[in-house]
Amino acid sequence: MALQIDGERHLMRLTLGALAELEAGLEEGSLVELVRRFEEGRCSTRDVLALIVAGLRGGGWDGTAKDLLSAEIAGGPMAAARAAAELLARAFMLPEES
């Protein structure tokens, strides 16, 4: 999936390394608790930012969360929240059986 930041399209994916980095940086709990917060609609902007950074890093981006604080994300904060939720859902989706 992709997100447009400051007019530039960036690919995002949650690789195993990106997930490990995300979990290590979480201030509140584990990935399971992060998933639960999203499912229950209790995610914070900090959760959204952490997921977007992890997805971008998994897609090859070299930036940091600080780089995104003043960035313009196409679609605004709601688009960022939707992208974060979709990243999380895709990361834990079971592969389709062939």
Question: Could you say what each language-model-derived stretch is?
Answer:
Residues I52:
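A residue-level signal for conserved active-site and pocket-lining positions in enzyme catalytic cores
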Residues L14-L19:
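A short, sequence-level motif marking secondary-structure junctions
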Residues M1-R9, A24, G29-R46, R57-S98:
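Charged interaction scaffolds used for protein-protein
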